[in-house]
């Protein structure tokens, strides 16, 4: 038997029609506007901000070329030309008069001058390479927002040669195998930053961790503050030299001083807020006084300063800017330092008893 029909249902209000979405009018971009478009990159904006602060600091500390400075430079140039002319005249007179002693002395002095000029040229070349690394980072920033094709691969292959990576290196082989003819410059540089650059960054991180641990242990176990200061200064200079060598930069005397100065300026002016943000609250929440002695806490502080120095040296020596999530954090090194100190100091106490 069939079921009875349901009664009719009357609605008090009429059914509301669904509102159709309002679509914006289509916008057409020409080729010139499309070339200027690039996605937002907060990490690159942060890099640009740090570079701007560093540039302002360097401009403020750079001595202005006054009139007296120009006069001294002109006088030194004239004096150098006069010395060269007088030396040529002495050599000519000694040769004509057969004064072999004067001729030998003049020749020895000329060789010393040539050696000094060669050293100056070598130092200038190394300083130029250090300055060129900053220009390469600017080129990399431009390529990371570029839609062009062809320049990214040439640029990355140049970076690989500077780093001493041959064609048989596994990371370089993976990068070459990942490339496709449809990739633009931004994608090529990003692949290089993710596949090849970490091979060098991991070595630099290991060096920073080792040097920071040595500084922390030295402060924790040594009772002599003067010896601690000298040791940390020496190890920090060694760390900067090591990081520069890993990234293919050969440092001379003046280039080493310039790099060390840039690192310290960057830490003092651009890194204070970041240091507080990464370590400050987490440091207070650890209650270090309950876990370690005051001397060990001082060692952790010295180790963190060494790690901070190494991170900024990495930033100045890397040919590429930091991408999102690539930059080392002090929190990682802090945890390593605490674990090493907790494992080392009890052993020393047991051996002492």
UniProtKB/Swiss-Prot annotation:
<keyword id="KW-0812">Transmembrane</keyword>
<feature type="transmembrane region" description="Helical">
    <location>
        <begin position="71"/>
        <end position="91"/>
    </location>
</feature>
<dbReference type="InterPro" id="IPR021147">
    <property type="entry name" value="DUF697"/>
</dbReference>
<keyword id="KW-0997">Cell inner membrane</keyword>
<feature type="transmembrane region" description="Helical">
    <location>
        <begin position="101"/>
        <end position="121"/>
    </location>
</feature>
<keyword id="KW-1003">Cell membrane</keyword>
<dbReference type="Pfam" id="PF05128">
    <property type="entry name" value="DUF697"/>
</dbReference>
<comment type="similarity">
    <text>Belongs to the UPF0283 family.</text>
</comment>
<dbReference type="InterPro" id="IPR006507">
    <property type="entry name" value="UPF0283"/>
</dbReference>
<protein>
    <recommendedName>
        <fullName>UPF0283 membrane protein YPTS_2342</fullName>
    </recommendedName>
</protein>
<keyword id="KW-0472">Membrane</keyword>
<dbReference type="GO" id="GO:0005886">
    <property type="term" value="C:plasma membrane"/>
</dbReference>
<feature type="transmembrane region" description="Helical">
    <location>
        <begin position="214"/>
        <end position="234"/>
    </location>
</feature>
<keyword id="KW-1133">Transmembrane helix</keyword>
């Amino acid at each position: 038997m069939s079921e009875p029909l349901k009664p009719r249902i009357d609605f008090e209000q009429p059914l509301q029609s669904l509102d159709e979405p309002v679509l914006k009018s289509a916008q057409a971009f020409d080729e010139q506007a499309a070339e200027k478009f690039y996605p937002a990159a907060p990490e690159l904006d942060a890099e640009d901000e740090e570079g701007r602060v560093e540039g302002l600091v360097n401009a403020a500390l750079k001595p202005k070329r006054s009139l007296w400075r120009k006069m001294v430079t002109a006088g030194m140039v004239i004096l150098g030309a006069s010395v060269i002319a007088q030396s040529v005249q002495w050599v000519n007179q000694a040769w004509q008069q057969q004064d072999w002693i004067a001729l030998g002395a003049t020749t020895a002095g000329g060789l010393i001058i040539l050696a000094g000029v060669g050293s100056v040229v070598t130092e200038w070349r190394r300083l130029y390479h250090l300055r060129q690394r900053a220009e390469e980072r600017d080129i990399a920033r431009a390529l990371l927002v570029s839609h062009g094709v062809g320049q990214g691969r040439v640029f990355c292959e140049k970076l690989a040669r500077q780093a001493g990576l041959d064609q048989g290196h596994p990371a370089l082989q993976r990068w070459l195998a990942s490339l496709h003819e449809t990739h633009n410059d931004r994608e090529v540089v990003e692949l290089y930053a993710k596949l090849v650059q970490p091979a060098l960054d991991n070595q630099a991180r290991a060096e920073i961790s080792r040097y920071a641990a040595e500084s922390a242990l030295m402060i924790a176990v040594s009772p002599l503050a003067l010896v601690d200061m000298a040791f940390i200064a020496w190890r920090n200079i060694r760390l900067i030299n090591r990081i520069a060598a890993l990234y293919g930069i050969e440092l001379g005397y003046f280039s080493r001083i310039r790099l060390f100065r840039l690192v310290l300026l960057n830490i003092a002016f651009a890194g204070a807020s970041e240091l507080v943000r990464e370590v400050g609250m987490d440091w207070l929440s650890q209650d270090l006084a309950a876990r370690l002695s005051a001397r060990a806490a001082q060692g952790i502080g010295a180790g963190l300063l060494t790690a901070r120095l190494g991170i900024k040296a990495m930033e100045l020596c890397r040919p590429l800017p930091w991408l999102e999530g690539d930059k080392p954090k002090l929190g990682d090194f802090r945890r390593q330092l605490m674990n090493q100190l907790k494992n080392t100091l009890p052993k020393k106490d047991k051996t002492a008893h």
